[in-house]
Amino acid sequence: MQPAALLGLLGATVVAAVSSMPVDIRNHNEEVVTHCIIEVLSNALLKSSAPPITPECRQVLKKNGKELKNEEKSENENTRFEVRLLRDPADTSEAPGLSSREDSGEGDAQVPTVADTESGGHSRERAGEPPGSQVAKEAKTRYSKSEGQNREEEMVKYQKRERGEVGSEERLSEGPGKAQTAFLNQRNQTPAKKEELVSRYDTQSARGLEKSHSRERSSQESGEETKSQENWPQELQRHPEGQEAPGESEEDASPEVDKRHSRPRHHHGRSRPDRSSQEGNPPLEEESHVGTGNSDEEKARHPAHFRALEEGAEYGEEVRRHSAAQAPGDLQGARFGGRGRGEHQALRRPSEESLEQENKRHGLSPDLNMAQGYSEESEEERGPAPGPSYRARGGEAAAYSTLGQTDEKRFLGETHHRVQESQRDKARRRLPGELRNYLDYGEEKGEEAARGKWQPQGDPRDADENREEARLRGKQYAPHHITEKRLGELLNPFYDPSQWKSSRFERKDPMDDSFLEGEEENGLTLNEKNFFPEYNYDWWEKKPFEEDVNWGYEKRNPVPKLDLKRQYDRVAELDQLLHYRKKSAEFPDFYDSEEQMSPQHTAENEEEKAGQGVLTEEEEKELENLAAMDLELQKIAEKFSGTRRG
């Protein structure tokens, strides 16, 4: 009877509770919870062996417990934000350089702080109150979801921007990259975690439009706080220690920098830098001094976080110092925000002056200094070489000592090259003239290849004189080069000119000079040029020398070569015969004169004249053969002249 009475009493209480609830509120979760409570009680009273809680009821209770925990977390975060906003003095109206947008934003931010303080006191009472209607709840959840999506998009954009800035910092200092990347990753992960917590809190605990508005304002303030925390070491880099005159920084700096300075900084009890910039102190000093009470407590709670922040600040300061000493003028001008050139010159480091004095002591020329400046700029674009010298305290001295060593190596390399050239000149003086020309041409080819890689900054007149001398040296053998090239191309498709002959000289020589030179060497006139081709007899005397020079030519060129020597000899004989017959046809008195002929020739001629009356058949055949040979020689001569004209 007792269990039945208890069950009846329990049913009556449940019916009374359900009937007392308003009809408009249809909360499915509460109905499921009451149903689970009834089932648990009935199972415990009726069946002693049955499980006390079914798995569906357990899931429902877990969900409710999670929601309660999330609500408590969100309330704790709200109270923390409200305490920080109340702790931070609201003196934005005193700053004269702020924009109207930021004034309105901060004024709006102050209103929900009051609302948060009022609502924060009664947050415990409101947690137990039943929420509004289901339509209002759906509207709130949609609004909170859209807010969470917008915040996530903004967070992704902000992280991309931060990664771009971090990449530029890492390009300037790649040396001790591991510590910096670890610190930057830690820095990038903290705002993401905070934003995820805020978005979860928005989606799960939607309590009312008024409370969601206040929470939005507080989350915006927290986002500004995280941005100001992450921009703090970058501002340390942007504002050097020796920079004074904050009035000029307020006038010259962009409005974005002003906004960054005027944003509230909740970084472990730091105060805003607005008052410090108005009173005339640089913002770096105000940021570096931490509030005593709060900072000691926070350091005691989070020692690892503070140590990482201090190391990051020291490392950023060293990187800034090194990059300011090494960066070219345009980069530093952009970093200082459009300052005048005089002020930028005043900020030069003494290490640069010591480097210039060291260069003067070594006796380096200004051209070399200019080349060194270009190389330093290219090294900066690539990023400095990794090494421990940038992380050490004496990083500047180590970096500049390595630069000095490279300059000394360059200087020693130039002296060694000059000594080698002088030894080559001595050896060249002892060689015969033709072999010296061959060596000069090979050296010129090597110099041209080297000149394509590195142009020496010498006197251009010296280069022109050297080029002129090389051209004149090549002209000495230009005519027979042309002859050999023409004959080789005509007779052999695999013709390859010798390596020591320069087609560059033939291209660069004017046509009139080579034409007149060939005329003078052959002793021919312009009229004779039309009748027979140019021929140089000295070339056959110099041919053995060419064969000696190119003794490994067939081995170096695997292309099958025909017997060019035999063909060249045959063509030379034909050319000689043609030359003689043309001359004899044009000048019979010159070739048939008695002075040119020996007494034996005169006796033979007299005998021939005496017996010239009747020709035999053999003599007629010989004459026909000679006539045919003459025709062939004339055709060959026409081909030669045609190839020369073409």
UniProtKB/Swiss-Prot annotation:
It comes from the Eukaryota. Pfam families: Granin (PF01271). The modification Phosphoserine is found at residues 74, 93, 99-100, 104, 123, 146, 168, 205, 276-277, 295, 351, 354, 375, 378, 502-503, 514, 584, 593, 598. The modification Pyrrolidone carboxylic acid is found at Q476, Q567, Q634. Residues 182-191 have a biased composition (Polar residues). The modification Phosphothreonine is found at T79, T92. O-glycosylated by the trisaccharide, GalNAc-Gal-NeuAc, on 2 sites in the N-terminal. May be glycated. Extensively phosphorylated. Disulfide bonds join C36-C57. The record marks R161, E162, R275, S276, Q278, E279, A324, A325, M629, D630 as: Cleavage. Glycans are attached at S93, T113, T190, S222. Transmembrane segments: none annotated. The modification Phosphotyrosine is found at Y374. Residues 67-90, 119-128, 137-173, 208-228, 340-361, 406-425, 442-451, 459-472 have a biased composition (Basic and acidic residues). The modification Sulfotyrosine is found at Y315, Y441, Y535, Y591. Interacts with ITPR1 in the secretory granules. This is Secretogranin-1. It comes from Bos taurus (Bovine). The gene is CHGB.
